[in-house]
């Protein structure tokens, strides 16, 4: 539901705001119900036409947590394709990067496919904006170029062991 020109994200009333700011204030992300329905119909058509392997909305935690959830159990990695505006690390871009990675904007879904050309063609015919956020690989590392990297095995360990450690 977005293209490369969308490089910020909605952080008000988000999990990010709650964790990093110890706050949960502000408006919830705005939603255009007509656009939302169009977008979900589009994803259903992609599925019906066997163009996608999986789809996951980013509403809880944003793009990065969603990507990690999708990669976790297959221990895959991804080279993230950052929007041009935030590819150069500096203070302003770091703020935009956090919004892009953790914003809980509506009408954003991560789709995995083995048919990227068909996906692009179909999105144009349906007038839906899409952006290739990256390509998966077998490294087990989420690579955020020029910023950071995240080891999927560490995420899997946290996923499997956090609750047992808190409640022995």
Show the residue positions of the predicted features.
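Mobile "lid/hinge" segments at catalytic clefts and subdomain interfaces of large enzymes
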Residues: 1-31, 44-47, 105-106, 113-115
